[in-house]
Structures are given as structure tokens and as C-alpha cells.
Amino acid sequence: MCWTAKSFVRWLSSSVKYYPKDNHLQALCLCTKTKLNKCHILDWSRSPCNSAVPPGRILSWRLFSCKEGTKDLCKREKIASVTASELLYKDLLKSEQENWNKISRSYKAMTKRIKEKIEELHNKYTLHLESPRMRFGGNVYFEENGYILCSKADDDKGNVHILFSTEDMGFSGAYIKRIRISPDERYLATSLQSENSEEATCVIMKLGDVPFVEEVIPNVFSFEWATNDVLYYTSQKNLKCQNVFMTTFTNEKYTKLVYTEQDARFFVDIYCTKDRRFLTINSNSKTTSEVWLIDCRHPFKLPVLVQARTKGVIYHVEHRNNELYILTSYGEPAEYKLMKASVASTGMENWQLVYALEEKTKLIDLEMFRDHCIMFLQKAGYLYLNVIAFVSHSVQSIQLPTWACAFELESHPEHASSTCYFQLTSPVHPPRRFAYSFKENNLIEQAAEEVPIIMNCHTTRLLAKSKDETLVPITVFHNVNSKELHRKPLLVHVYGAYGIDLNMSFKEEKLMLIEEGWILAYCHVRGGGELGLRWHKDGCQQNKLKGLHDLKACIMLLHELGFSQPKYTALTAVSAGGVLAGAICNSDPELIRAVVLQAPFVDVLNTMMKTHLPLSIEEQEEWGNPLADEKCMKYIKNYCPYHNIKPQCYPSVFITAYENDQRVPLTGILRYVQKLRKATLDHASRTRKKGNWIPNIILDIQASGSHCDSSWEDSLNEVARHLAFLKKELQV
């Protein structure tokens, strides 16, 4: 994408730190990824997973009042403690791997059948989808299967030039995360990331008849061209970005540090305004922003502050006609507003309102053009496109097709473009391309004949009344031909953290389940962002239990309305969604028969108590600070999944974890599984009822990949195993 608004809205509105990032927590990537055409030209810098579960690290040893002669003993004790811990970890890891190898045999045949069906749907609906194109001047750039390609915009013969190949350049196995073309198109900068690491490498290519590598910069998160030969970038270390550098590609090459963020709660990245007038250095915590401007006409001058950080105010900056357009939460109500100010007077006291969102409206994305601004909104579960005309000072609202639940904005690097392109989708509807024309003032569906609308699926939008009378949205999908819905299997989805919406983009396996008669329910509980900033605030810190109450109300309403019943109900969650999923297993296990968790965050208290972890301080604005606030500690302990396990009849649980996951350390999941197994066995031994059901607690540890990015094959295998487990547990 061409400017920060897309990533900014998905990131700051959710207060997630490196979005894409799902935060421990954030992972919106539960299911299969596109086998081909995995394109990152549009670059969600805060992609579902750049955000941040604190990676594990051994706590620094503290010596209190060691007397002379005892210091060495303390060291020996420390080494012995660490060694014992490592041995225990290795033993548990080996034991779980052996256990899974035995159990997996019983799922093998069903897993194979599920994989074949998903691949069939993938080949039918998504394999041949065209990669997103980025028009820049007279050329069109796109990425496919590890290649960055270029063609002439007016070439209808399909001629393409290969500019970059991950394999040929020695980056086999890496995927392309981001692409930036210099204004004169002489240079191409791209970042590459492997499945097993969140650290990316930036490769700068000099284009021409024979493109070649000009420079390679390790550990880079975001980067933008200020001029034809001046590149700004942020460095990443331990999942944190706090430094901005400038490097030149002139005759006298040099690199210098431009900006350093001192506050550990803040994460720094950079973007270029749509008209390429300014680079913006964006320093953001989960609730507060500060932006600095670099004039692209004078890229060597010091950055200029827009507005000093003010607690609770998040903002992002665009530029048009010597005015800054500011997307911000400043003012009442505390939802997003579009404001403006002169470049000469950027302080908050000079901000003038342009447009304010209604309450309970989610700003999903925003794109600036020369004379227009387009906002993609969600209200009452439906998507809208609002077009703000700067010249006529008018606002037009267009409701998008009712089947649509998610959208993806295409890249528009030329801000003078007269058309805005985007794709609409839902969990059971493959992406369909649309275009809005500013000149014609109409919405057009592109190539409607290529991807047929799924006709056998019915979408229902419900409202469940939570414990405090708040109405919580639920989106339900089921086959129109299904009868006796109370006997059909139900798969409930939940997330509820960081202001992030549930992932409702197309997944082949979701369509497969619908065809097989399953019911899919997406519970938009508080803590997520489906109803705007307030919805997130009402479900974080001292309000976390509201998300749990919401989830319980949603499941109970579904059952009351005849959508399945407890013995046919399964729950699925990813990363931070594991908090609510794990909590409801403790509080109301009778509502659910089986649970699938992917890299779940299940030990909030222990994680937040360890401030040596890179992201624990940042996470305090989401979960609270239990070290400084005893009330907060007790509150977290009241809902934390790990701390509330007790002997009772639990649902069966299948957990996928990753050995090298930087965001959700495997050690915490191992402890959780051990404690959960013990509780289920204790309960079984106490009750001793004839035919007493003992749930299956399964841990599948993957040696590679992560809950953010996995290869197509790995992701396909994971999904197939999850569904095989659910079918066996629900006996369908």
C-alpha cells in the first residue's frame, strides 16, 4: 500500500504493535494461505502477525545481599536452575512430540481426505486469481511465487520482465514482504522474510537492462524512498523498532541515524504520503501517537514534529495542497475523525474537523486521492464506502454488497488516479474485484463471470445480550439446504483483543464445511474492533471479563435459536484469542465439546509479570500492569486460562504450537497442556462414573513456521489436522 492509513487503521485502531501483527497475540491467520500469488506489494506493514507476543528469555539473575564467599554459590545455583529448566523443557518437548506421533496415526486417513477437498476448492476458486498490480508511471509491478515482475502499462501482449527472484538471489524459502520503487524507477527496494523468523532483510536492486543488487540491509522493518536515491528505513531488534536511518545511493554513499525512540512502549515505522511530499516517522504505543515529518524536497533536513504525543490520542498524517489531513481519535466522541491543518501550523490547537465517524462505526481503511478521500466502514455488520469530495465538500455513502464481510484495498501509488480498486470477500465467498470511479460516481464489479457467487450459503446477523445488557454482534453462515440445524455441527470463532476484527476473509476450508452442513459463527466480542475504538476499550485491561461474558452470551443465543447444541459445538481461536477461548473452557465447559487453538496466549499473568520480555511493557496498555497494580494482578488472575484450570470435565482440546515462535513461547503452552491434562485426569478419577468421558488434550508442535506465516503446504496440513480432530470429537 502506498501510505500508512491502511496499516495505520488496522494497527493503531487496534493498538497492535506490528501488525500485521496479531500480537501475542494477534494472529488472524488461522487457516490456509494462498498457495500461489502470495503477494505483499500492498504491504500490510502491520500484518496479522507483526504484532507481538513477548518472546521468551531467561530472567536476569538478582543477587540480594550475598556475603563474601557466597557469590559463587549464587552463580552455581543460577546455572543449575537454568540447566534443570532446560532439561525439563527438552524432556517435555520430546514427550509431546512422541505423543503426537502416536496419536496422529488415527487422523491420517481423514486428514488426507480433507486435504484433497481443500486443494480442490483452492484450485477452483483461488489458485488462478491474478496477483495485485501496482501501476507506477508507465509500468506495472507485481509479485508472483517469489518473483518481482514488471510490464508496460500499455502492453496487452503479456510481456513481463523479471526484476528479482528470491531463489536466484540466494533467498530460497523467503517470501517477499514489501516492495518500494524509487520515484524515477531506477531502484527497487524489497524486504524478504523467512517462515522461521520475524526479522526481514531489505534488498536494494538497481534496475536497468540487467538488474543487480546494490545493497543488502539486515533487520529492516519498514522503508520508503524520500527521493530518487535517498532511502529511509527502520531497524528491528527483538521485535521492536526504535531507530530510523537514512542511506544514500549517490556517488558519496553514507548511512546515518535520524531518529531514536526512547520509550519502550512505542514502536516506530515510516511511510510516504500519497503525493510523495513528506515521509512520516510514526511513533506509536497502543494508545498514543507522535508523528515527525521529513520534507522529500529537502531529505537531509531534520524531521519536524507535527504534534507532541498526548496520552490517549492516536493520529496519522497525510498531505494535500499544503495541508495535513490527520486521521485521529482526538476529541469526543473517542472514535476516528478526519481533520486538517496547515503545514505551517500543525499543532493540535489548529486541527479543523473534516469528517467524524458515527459511534459504533468501524473505520476499516482509508485511502487518499488528489481530490477525494475514500473511507471503508463497517456498521451493524455491513460494509460501506464513504467518498469525501474535498472540492465540493460533500460526502457520499454507498452500501457494499450484503454478502461481503471483508475487503482488501489495492495499491494506488498515483494519487491523481480517477479510480479506486478493491476486493470484497467473506469466509465462504472468494474475492471479487470492484472499482469506484470518481468521474462516473459509480461502483462497478470487475470480471463478474470469473468467480461465481456462492449461492448455497445463507448469512445471518444476530445480536446477543451480554451480562451487562450490551448487544454483541454475531455473523452466522450455514447451508441454505440444511434441515434440523440443531443437529448440525457448529464452529464458533472468537478473538477479542487489540481492537482487531475477526479474520473474515475467504478460506477454502470454511466453504468446505458449509458444503458439508456445518454452521459457522463469528462472535464479535468486546476487545475486538468491530464496533470502533470504544468497542476495543470496553474489552481491554479492567474490562477483559466483558469479552468472556460476550462469548458466553453468543454461544448460548446460538443454541437457543436452534443453531446446533453443546455436544456438536466447537470453538476455534488464534493467538490472543486463546485468552477468551481458554477462559470459557474454565468457566463454562459444558457449552463446548471441542476446541482448536493455534499458538494460543494462555498465560497472561506470568507473561505480564516478566518485564524483561521485549514486548511486555508495550502490552500493558492492553492487559494492564500487574507488577505495579495489585488490583490488576488479581483481575488478570481471575480470568487467565492457565491460573484457572481446575478438576472438571473439559472439552477436548487440540493445540498447534511452534517450536521457534517468537511471540508465543512454547514453554508456556507446554505448562498449560500439562496442567490441563492433570486436571482432566483428576476429575475422572474422582467421579469414577461408568462410561465417564475423558477429553483428549493434544499438542501438535511444529518445528518450523509460526502462527503468523507458514508455507502453503504446512498451513494446509495444519488445517486438515484441526478439522480431522473436530470431526472425530463431534462424531460427524
Swiss-Prot record:
Active site: S575, D661, H707
Example GO molecular function: serine-type endopeptidase activity
Main location class: cytoplasm
Record keywords, A-Z: Cytoplasm, Hydrolase, Protease, Serine protease
GO cellular component, one term: cytoskeleton
EC number: 3.4.21.-
Alphabetical GO biological process terms: proteolysis
Top-rank taxon, per record: Eukaryota
InterPro entries hit by this protein: AB_hydrolase_fold, Pept_S9A_N, Peptidase_S9_cat, Peptidase_S9A, Serine_Peptidase_S9A
Subcellular localization(s) per the UniProt record: Cytoplasm, Cytosol
Pfam families in UniProt: Peptidase_S9 (PF00326), Peptidase_S9_N (PF02897)
Quaternary structure note: Homodimer.
Function as written in the Swiss-Prot or TrEMBL entry: Serine peptidase whose precise substrate specificity remains unclear. Does not cleave peptides after a arginine or lysine residue. Regulates trans-Golgi network morphology and sorting by regulating the membrane binding of the AP-1 complex. May play a role in the regulation of synaptic vesicle exocytosis.
Family listed: Belongs to the peptidase S9A family.
Name of the protein in its database record: Prolyl endopeptidase-like
Organism name: Gallus gallus
Taxonomic lineage from the root: Eukaryota, Metazoa, Chordata, Craniata, Vertebrata
This protein's encoding gene: PREPL
